[in-house]
């Protein structure tokens, strides 16, 4: 019996650790519906809405960093009437905003996934983040060890881009929540 309890203890610790991690990741967290004009989605309640700084930004949500990270993650929902270039052109532009440890563009991952009623291109990359300047807006600061997750939702009238950037550890922890958000993406008529 004592050998059996010794064997079980690591499993109990592992299960307890997994349960704690699920709470940190928001797996059991209630969600709220975010309306971004012609697009809606569900996001964890802890993702706080912040004022947008431009009409092309339909929504912005801030997510507090995990312990050890110094700044929050920010999800920005952009809407561009008529689109904003091809998926490939945007991948190239975003890849150019990041550098790996050798100063080269990092690998960028892209795949097509399903939203609630639309196809979505999910994009991910990481490294030293140096965002491009947007005319008329305050520049974003450069960030070491950053990660970006993007959902691209093209429609006949508008191209939607959900771009989330933050510290690597925080963003890695947020991947399941971001993927759940993508699954809930719903295109509505504008």
Give the location of each predicted region:
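Solvent-exposed coil/turn segments that connect beta secondary-structure elements
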Residues: 37, 66, 80-82, 126-130, ...
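Bacterial N-terminal signal peptides that target proteins for export
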Residues: 2-16
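Surface-exposed amphipathic alpha-helical segments
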Residues: 47, 156-190
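Secretory pathway targeting signatures of secreted, lumenal, and periplasmic proteins
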Residues: 33, 37, 42-103
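Bacterial Sec-dependent signal peptides at the C-terminal "C-region" and cleavage site
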Residues: 17, 23-31
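Solvent-exposed, acidic/flexible segments
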Residues: 54, 68-70, 83-87, 142-145, ...
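Signature of long, low-cysteine stretches enriched in small and polar/charged residues
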Residues: 45, 55-58, 91-153
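Beta-strand-rich interaction surfaces with strong enrichment in secreted/lumenal proteins
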Residues: 31, 49, 110-112
């Amino acid at each position: 019996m004592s050998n059996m309890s010794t064997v079980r203890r690591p499993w109990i610790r592992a299960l307890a650790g997994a349960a704690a991690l699920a709470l940190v990741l928001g797996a059991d967290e209630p969600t709220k519906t975010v309306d971004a004009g012609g697009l809606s989605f569900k996001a964890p309640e802890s993702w706080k809405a912040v004022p947008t700084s431009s009409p092309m930004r339909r929504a912005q949500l801030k997510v507090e960093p995990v312990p050890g990270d110094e700044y929050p993650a920010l999800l920005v929902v952009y809407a561009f009437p008529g689109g904003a270039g091809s998926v490939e052109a945007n991948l190239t532009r975003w890849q150019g905003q990041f550098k790996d440890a050798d100063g080269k563009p990092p690998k960028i991952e892209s795949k097509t996934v399903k939203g609630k009623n639309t196809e979505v291109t999910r994009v991910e990359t990481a490294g030293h983040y140096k965002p491009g300047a947007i005319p008329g807006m305050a520049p974003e600061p450069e960030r070491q060890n950053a990660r970006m997750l993007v959902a691209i939702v093209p429609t006949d009238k508008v191209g939607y881009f959900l771009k989330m950037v933050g510290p690597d550890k925080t963003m890695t922890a947020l991947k399941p929540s971001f993927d759940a958000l993508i699954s809930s993406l719903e295109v509505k008529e504008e």
